[in-house]
Amino acid sequence: MSVNYSEDNNRTAVVVGLQFGDEGKGKITDFLSESYDVVVRFNGGTNAGHTVVVGNETYKFHLLPSGSLRTKVVVLGSGMVIDPQSLISEIEIVKKNNSNLAVVVSSNAHVVTKIHKYLDVEEEKIRSSMVIGTTAQGIGPTYEDKYARSGLRMIDLLDYKTIIEKLDIIYRMHENLLSRSEFSDPSVRENLAKELYSYGQELKKYMYYTDILINKLYNEGRTILFEGAQGVLLDPDFGFYPYVTSSNTISASSYTGTGFSMRKIKKVIGVAKAYVSKVGAGPFPTELNDDLAKKIRDAGGEYGTTTGRPRRVGWLDVPLLKYAVQIDDVDEIALTKVDTLGILHTIKVCYSYELDGKQIDYIPKHISEVSRVKPLYEEFEGWGDLSSSLLHPKMRKWEIPQQLRRYIDFIEEQIGRPVTIISSGKDRSKTVRIER
């Protein structure tokens, strides 16, 4: 079938995070997924935590795309690293609510094992003063093995002999850290291999070459939404290295993580909180460390979906947001947690930095420089409770409360991109598309 690449701008889209992750991508993907036939996730693993609230029910996704409750087909791309036990549990839960959902898992995606989780903890100990704050889900070590060409893939789980051979290779590659662990015992590795083989038998009905499938569905005219994990500021190439994640998180990663060309993507939707939050160590120019931080954290429920750890919070950082929009080539912005800031009388936004007494128009990359930047702030009046203001799924901009509208106008002027979606509260229904 011949495809006209100039057709419908909503046919394919990518949802990405514009901050340090936890921006609310799950809720936005769920909101958008009703309009898409297929939702594809392309990076990360169980280190991601996407929460969707529907009525009285709360769903927490770590592997399955957040669109799993509303769409017809979900795909886990080859750029992901998959904990098979967690995946089986998630599929069981989501099938109870969307029994007709088709789940497809890339045969080429790499597998997280108990060995990788052990290594994650041990490697974090070695980092000492440069501790990252890993989720200890085994994500980093799994990607290490992937790029060392010694990793275990989903398709390998169908052959017991291959599993044993690869586990032995992984052990020898990391013997300096594993020699004092239970995994030094060959019988323990054999039992792990049996466990992984049993997972493979259970998951084989979901496995396929997803690059072929996604392109086939596209050529058949299906609408496809790509969902990223984490955020651009955690990207190993464009974030504050080494305080980053182990997979690429930018919009272009949808190409390398699925085999679907970026030339066919019609829209990039960047998700940002109305403030900033972060889990783990690393630079955070606008971070708050006083009672106000606790007030925002508690109001916004800023505790990690995967770890339960309290998140660091701070004011919205326009320089970082501009940078993220540029890297991701964002077309429009979804702004989340606007209700959380509404509780404050005065709200600040960082519009620029000073470094060593001079105003700068770039993002320093050296950690020592970032630690010295001084945020310059613009102040805004709070907009109060939004529960009686944002009542419809679509609203004209002039219908939005004036103080919130001024905040949005400032962001749009600074970033040069429209805010097309605003989200308040946890529930799916508390999401508004701004019509112009």
Curated annotation (Swiss-Prot):
CDD domains per record: AdSS
InterPro entries found in the cross-reference section: Adenylosuccin_syn_GTP-bd, Adenylosuccin_syn_Lys_AS, Adenylosuccinate_synth_dom1, Adenylosuccinate_synth_dom2, Adenylosuccinate_synth_dom3, Adenylosuccinate_synthetase, P-loop_NTPase
Cell compartments where the protein resides: Cytoplasm
Cellular component, GO annotation: cytoplasm
Subunit and partners: Homodimer.
Primary location recorded for the protein, binned into one broad class: cytoplasm
Functional pathway: Purine metabolism; AMP biosynthesis via de novo pathway; AMP from IMP: step 1/2
First-tier enzyme category under EC: ligase
EC number of the protein: 6.3.4.4
Similarity comment text for this entry: Belongs to the adenylosuccinate synthetase family.
Binding site for substrate: 305-311
Active site, per annotation: 22, 50
Necessary cofactors: Mg(2+)
One Pfam family cited in the UniProt record for this chain: Adenylsucc_synt
SUPFAM superfamilies: P-loop containing nucleoside triphosphate hydrolases
Chain residues that bind IMP: 22-25, 47-50, 135, 149, 230, 245, 309
UniProt-annotated binding residues for GTP: 21-27, 49-51, 311, 337-339, 423-425
Entry superkingdom: Archaea
Biological process terms in GO annotation: 'de novo' AMP biosynthetic process; IMP metabolic process
Binding site for Mg(2+): 22, 49
Catalysed reactions, as listed in the record: IMP + L-aspartate + GTP = N(6)-(1,2-dicarboxyethyl)-AMP + GDP + phosphate + 2 H(+)
Role summary: Plays an important role in the de novo pathway of purine nucleotide biosynthesis. Catalyzes the first committed step in the biosynthesis of AMP from IMP.
Organism: Thermoplasma volcanium (strain ATCC 51530 / DSM 4299 / JCM 9571 / NBRC 15438 / GSS1)
Gene: purA
Cofactor note: Binds 1 Mg(2+) ion per subunit.
The entry's keywords: Cytoplasm, GTP-binding, Ligase, Magnesium, Metal-binding, Nucleotide-binding, Purine biosynthesis
Molecular function via GO: adenylosuccinate synthase activity; GTP binding; magnesium ion binding
Protein name: Adenylosuccinate synthetase
